[in-house]
């Protein structure tokens, strides 16, 4: 009897593991860790110290995963009503709310200890503040309270480059804040494009996203304006001497592409274009930070 029991229980173990992993939003965390790594590299003119590098990436990743799991927990009711999220572990009942809370608390606590002990207290507390900003202030309150939810709450999501910088230097620097500004301005057009595509679902669950409260055309205008502001912000690393020609060329090309996509969305919209803008924004941020990294090592 033992052997059949072992075989039949194996799929549930695999499913549980995958469900917990899904709650950490691994794709989002991976992009975030890229910006953390770039922040680390730009902070150091030489080779990165091994301990802050490994402990910093691991601790920040764990606390980011904890914040994502708390997001799943808090949003479980509305997730069950939206086509994009109804199959998540909590709405489907594959993981209970209690277990999700324990998982998030354990993951976040361990990440905090790793950062505090093996990196530095400054990075640990800044990462904790980001977790609170995203999981509680944004998810639990702002998301349901104001159409400017993503603008205000976006500050928490813009912190990773600063976290990477402080992880290896244990201090603030103006250059790190420039990277925060870039992600802060990138966040609204990124999420508003998705909100346009999913506006009916957001309206159904009473989430006051900008397309729901102010209309699609107003949101398209805001996306276009933010992409222009973002393009200006992307030039700041060059203007302050932080980055060189390679980054300037790459960032200019990416900014032109993003503005063009936003202009198309405003004046030549067609079915599926909002999601194209959303996807382009992801590649924009990823390639922009890769350009920062390459430029740093090629032109330093």
From Swiss-Prot:
It is a multi-pass membrane protein. The chain crosses the membrane at residues 28-48, 50-70, 100-120, 122-142, 149-169, 176-196, 222-242, 243-263, 280-300. Pfam families: UbiA. It is found in: Cell inner membrane. InterPro entries: Protohaem_IX_farnesylTrfase (IPR006369), UbiA_prenyltransferase (IPR000537), UbiA_prenylTrfase_CS (IPR030470), UbiA_sf (IPR044878). Carbon 2 of the heme B porphyrin ring is defined according to the Fischer nomenclature. HAMAP family: CyoE_CtaB. Converts heme B (protoheme IX) to heme O by substitution of the vinyl group on carbon 2 of heme B porphyrin ring with a hydroxyethyl farnesyl side group. This is Protoheme IX farnesyltransferase. The gene is cyoE.
């Amino acid at each position: 009897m033992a052997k059949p029991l072992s075989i039949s229980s194996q799929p549930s173990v695999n499913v549980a593991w995958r469900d917990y992993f899904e709650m950490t939003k691994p794709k989002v965390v991976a992009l975030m860790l890229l910006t953390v790594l770039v922040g680390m590299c730009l902070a150091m003119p030489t080779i990165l110290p091994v301990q802050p590098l490994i402990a910093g990436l691991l601790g920040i990743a764990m606390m980011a995963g904890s914040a994502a799991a708390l997001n799943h927990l808090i949003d479980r009711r509305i997730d069950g009503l939206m086509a994009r999220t109804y199959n998540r572990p909590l709405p489907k009942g594959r993981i209970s709310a209690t277990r999700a809370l324990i998982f998030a608390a354990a993951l976040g606590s361990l990440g905090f200890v790793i950062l505090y002990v093996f990196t530095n207290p400054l990075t640990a507390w800044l990462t904790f503040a980001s977790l609170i900003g995203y999981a509680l202030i944004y998810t639990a309150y702002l998301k349901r309270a104001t159409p400017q939810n993503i603008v205000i709450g976006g500050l928490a999501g813009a912190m990773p480059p600063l976290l990477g910088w402080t992880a290896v230097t244990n201090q603030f620097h103006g250059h790190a804040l420039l990277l925060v500004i870039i992600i802060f301005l990138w966040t609204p057009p990124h999420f508003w494009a998705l909100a346009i595509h999913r506006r009916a679902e957001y309206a159904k669950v009473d989430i006051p996203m900008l397309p729901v409260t102010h209309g699609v055309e107003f949101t398209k205008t805001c996306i276009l304006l933010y992409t222009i502001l973002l393009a200006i912000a992307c030039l700041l690393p060059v203007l302050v001497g932080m980055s060189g020609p390679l980054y300037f060329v790459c960032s200019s090309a990416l900014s032109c592409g993003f503005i063009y996509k936003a202009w198309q969305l405003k004046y030549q919209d067609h079915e599926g274009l909002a999601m194209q803008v959303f996807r382009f924004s992801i590649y924009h941020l990823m390639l922009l930070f890769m350009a920062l990294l390459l430029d740093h090592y090629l032109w330093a």
